[in-house]
């Protein structure tokens, strides 16, 4: 079995893709589904999210650009904001600067796509090992097209879990992520010291960074579930 870490999204995933945008999209996605959202519909663009609402009027819109809530949307991209339970039973359409785009990239070819974060790191590692047949790829979303320390650290945490569970052929990306994990301090330190962590702190969103640094507090696995009933331009993720 191969274990691969892409420091930025690639275009070919033959088997399992674990998509990470730890600050904050995939952490928020886990939280939305954990708080009872019926389903999560990820879109690449704001326009696509608004188009979904035209066809499915009862959805909630969640998303950010530049770290801030998109004007006219119901929610931002804050795991702290969505942890209050107001999303229970609702369909949520989500678009973010980096994470939802990475999910769409992975979904072009991967047989299994899962949203991964530190909060569900152990659960997604076990799930990936259970469903993979040839390769597990950990896909870092990055920040505005550049490698993000926060995602690489989180990838290293998941890679470390996987190596404790099975034998793998490890690529250089995985070695880089493991080195970052082992030398990066605890999760809070690593995320706060990242460029994106610092940006969120400047925006007054340090509580989101602290939330995202929690390790394996959730067993929820947001899993891509395609279907003819999924609105155009969206990917449907359900709680697994």
From Swiss-Prot:
TM spans (from-to): none
GO molecular function: 2-phosphosulfolactate phosphatase activity; magnesium ion binding; sulfopyruvate decarboxylase activity
Pfam family, one: 2-ph_phosp
Family annotation (SUPFAM superfamilies): ComB-like (SSF142823)
Keyword Manganese included in the entry's annotation: no
Alphabetic keyword roster: Hydrolase, Magnesium
EC nos: 3.1.3.71
Enzyme class: hydrolase
Reaction catalysis annotation: (2R)-O-phospho-3-sulfolactate + H2O = (2R)-3-sulfolactate + phosphate
Cofactors that this protein relies on: Mg(2+)
InterPro entries: ComB-like, ComB-like_sf
Family: Belongs to the ComB family.
NCBIfam families xrefs: PRK14100.1
Designated name of the protein: Probable 2-phosphosulfolactate phosphatase
Classification lineage: Bacteria, Thermotogati, Deinococcota, Deinococci, Deinococcales
């Amino acid at each position: 079995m191969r274990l691969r870490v892409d420091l930025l999204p690639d275009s070919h995933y033959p088997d399992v893709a674990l998509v990470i945008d730890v600050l904050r999209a995939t952490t928020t996605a886990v939280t939305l589904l954990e708080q009872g959202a019926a389903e999560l519909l990820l879109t690449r663009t704001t326009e696509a999210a608004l188009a979904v609402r035209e066809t499915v009027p009862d959805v909630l819109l969640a998303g950010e650009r530049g770290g801030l809530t998109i004007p006219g949307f119901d929610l931002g991209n804050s795991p702290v904001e969505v942890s209050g339970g107001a999303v229970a039973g609702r369909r949520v359409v989500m678009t973010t600067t980096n994470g939802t785009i990475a999910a769409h990239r992975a979904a072009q070819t991967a047989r299994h796509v899962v949203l991964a974060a530190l909060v569900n790191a152990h659960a997604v590692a076990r799930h990936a090992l259970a469903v993979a047949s040839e390769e597990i790829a950990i896909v870092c979303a990055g920040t505005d097209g550049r490698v993000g320390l926060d995602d690489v650290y989180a990838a290293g945490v998941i890679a470390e879990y996987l190596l404790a569970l099975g034998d793998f052929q490890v690529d250089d990306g995985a070695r880089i992520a493991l080195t970052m994990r082992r030398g990066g301090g605890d999760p809070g330190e690593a995320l706060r010291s990242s460029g994106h962590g610092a940006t969120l702190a400047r925006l007054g969103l340090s509580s989101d960074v602290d939330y995202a640094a929690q390790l394996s507090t959730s067993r929820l696995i947001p899993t891509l579930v395609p279907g003819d009933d999924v609105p155009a331009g969206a990917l449907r993720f359900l709680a697994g």
